[in-house]
């Protein structure tokens, strides 16, 4: 199981109260059974002693609590009610539930190639790639994780199809509840996620019934009845999700603007709302047929206790439900800002009292790993300084942090503050002061201190995964980019080892101080008029529409 500080702390706490051999099972360990005491408790469990709590927004009340004025009522249980409850003649016949079909009974391990330290391409065709490896760190566990992506080329950028796919996803989730619950009880999970240009299937857990779980999920997606009632529920969920996004706290709303810009293609919320109302069951049916029949590629990544033949068999099972034309692999697209020098400022009025400002700085011209290595190390250095300055010393806001971020293949630094007392204008003034002071601190940093920061980052990157999920995650970026060498992380580590203090200074000077690359500021302005002054950023373009903004940038393929 994945380790955590809370888990370790809990074990230490148990050691103070129980013998070492019982620190895990102590809630279930008993030395003797007191039958008399148990029977005495059971004898008290009668209708005469019962207390029933009913929570219902339609319940009739006649009292209020003293301090919070919460409405409530107290009623005695009538003799007629008791008699009705004790009449068992109308009770349905009780039956044991059907056996969970996903419980594992075979925990044997597959014979595997222990020398395979990264996923290996075990099958390749024009529109098919299958990568697999046994777990290097958890090879003694009968578990695996597998991801299967079906892509459709050429890709479309169509609002109706995008909304239809999202609604179909909600509808599918509604009918998959039983399978998902059974799988979770059996120590497994699986998902079918979709967009207008493809489907991703994922499953993890004990391997004995993993293929069956995936097959059941796929077949249910293929065959479930599309009804007006389910569509109405899906539309409600979609609208509720849009409503939640509009009611998020100030900083989340500010950050969401940059996230939406980086996620191509994006459609404005107002357009999504209008389209939701137009979608019919025919649109949903067309989308399902498209996803089931129009795939042009299948890409698979499996890590864990699955043999190569088992992985291939799962892929074959997928293609019995989702038709793969096996014609073209497309690894996806991204918004390219690498050469951009545009400065953007998005301002949004929100219904909260708080304000938030988040601003992201990106360099110009760095390749992906060169930029990522510098941004990662600078984040480790600046994040504590930023928090100590704006949060601890200046008490500017209760949410203050700096971190490295990425749009497409370009990495940069992002600074975020949410404040109940400062306007976006004041936050930006403190940012500018902090940036200048930090440049001086970076220049004055000793070689020894710089080496400590670098060693700390390398230790984190070289830390062994603590779960199969973490081990799988190490390969996801390379897999999604089509890098069959799976050496993205190894190259990043080598670059960080070679970084000098001057490399960091140059990156900071160009990115933050001189702002030679792309900059995106996002302000969420609350309704408190005393602190509603926006940051007027010289030379920045005002952004009115993220959807329109995306059209001004080149879209590239990985």
Regions found by a protein language model. Give the residues of each.
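Extended, domain-scale alpha-helical bundle/helix-rich regions
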Residues: 41-51, 57-60
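Glycine-centered hinge/linker elements that transmit conformational signals in sensory
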Residues: 314-329
């Amino acid at each position: 199981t994945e380790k955590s500080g809370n888990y370790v702390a809990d074990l230490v706490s148990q050691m103070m109260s129980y013998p070492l051999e019982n620190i895990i099972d102590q809630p279930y360990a008993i030395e003797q059974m007191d039958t008399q005491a148990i029977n005495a408790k059971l004898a008290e469990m009668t209708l005469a002693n019962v207390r029933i709590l009913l929570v219902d927004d339609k319940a009739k009340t006649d009292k209020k609590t003293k301090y919070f004025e919460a409405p409530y009522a107290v009623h005695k249980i009538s003799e007629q009610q008791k008699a009705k409850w004790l009449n068992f003649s109308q009770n349905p016949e009780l039956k044991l539930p059907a056996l969970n079909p996903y419980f594992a009974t075979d925990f044997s391990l597959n014979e595997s190639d222990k020398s395979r330290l990264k996923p290996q391409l075990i099958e390749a065709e024009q529109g098919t790639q299958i990568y697999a490896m046994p777990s290097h760190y958890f090879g003694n566990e009968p578990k695996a994780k597998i991801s299967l992506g079906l892509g459709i080329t050429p890709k479309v950028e169509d609002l109706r199809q995008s909304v239809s796919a999202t609604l179909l996803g909600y509808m599918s989730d509604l009918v998959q509840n039983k399978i998902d619950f059974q799988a979770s009880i059996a120590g497994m999970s699986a998902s079918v996620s979709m967009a207008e240009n493809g489907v991703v299937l994922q499953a993890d857990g004990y391997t004995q019934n993993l293929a069956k779980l995936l097959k059941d999920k796929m077949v249910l997606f293929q065959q479930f009845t599309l009804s007006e009632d389910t569509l109405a529920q899906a539309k409600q969920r979609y609208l509720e999700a849009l409503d939640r996004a509009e009611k998020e706290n100030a900083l989340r709303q500010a950050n969401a603007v940059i996230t939406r810009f980086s996620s191509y293609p994006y459609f404005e919320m107002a357009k999504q709302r209008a389209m939701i109302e137009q979608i019919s069951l025919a649109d949903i049916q067309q989308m399902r047929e498209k996803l089931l029949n129009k795939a042009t590629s299948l890409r698979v990544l499996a890590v864990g206790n699955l043999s190569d033949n088992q992985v291939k068999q799962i892929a074959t099972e997928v293609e019995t439900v989702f038709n793969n034309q096996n014609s073209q692999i497309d690894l996806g697209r991204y918004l390219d800002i690498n050469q951009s020098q545009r400065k953007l400022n998005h301002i949004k009025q929100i219904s909260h009292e708080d304000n938030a400002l988040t601003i992201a700085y990106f360099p110009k011209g760095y390749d992906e790993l060169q930029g990522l290595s510098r941004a990662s190390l600078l984040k480790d250095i600046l994040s504590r300084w930023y928090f100590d300055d704006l949060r601890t010393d200046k008490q500017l806001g209760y949410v203050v942090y700096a971190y490295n971020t990425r749009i497409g293949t370009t990495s940069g630094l992002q600074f975020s503050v949410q404040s109940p007392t400062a306007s976006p204008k004041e936050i930006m003034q403190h940012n500018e002061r902090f940036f200048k002071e930090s440049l001086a601190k970076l220049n004055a940093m000793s070689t020894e201190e710089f080496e400590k920061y670098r060693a700390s980052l390398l230790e984190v990157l070289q830390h062994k995964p603590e779960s199969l999920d973490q081990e799988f995650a190490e390969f996801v970026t390379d897999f999604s980019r089509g890098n069959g060498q799976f050496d993205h992380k190894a190259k990043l580590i080598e670059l960080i080892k070679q970084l000098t203090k001057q490399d960091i200074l140059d990156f900071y000077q160009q990115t933050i101080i001189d702002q030679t690359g792309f900059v995106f500021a996002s302000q969420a302005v609350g309704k408190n008029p005393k602190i509603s002054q926006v940051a007027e950023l010289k030379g920045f373009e005002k952004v009115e529409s993220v959807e329109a903004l995306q059209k001004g940038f080149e879209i590239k393929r990985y």
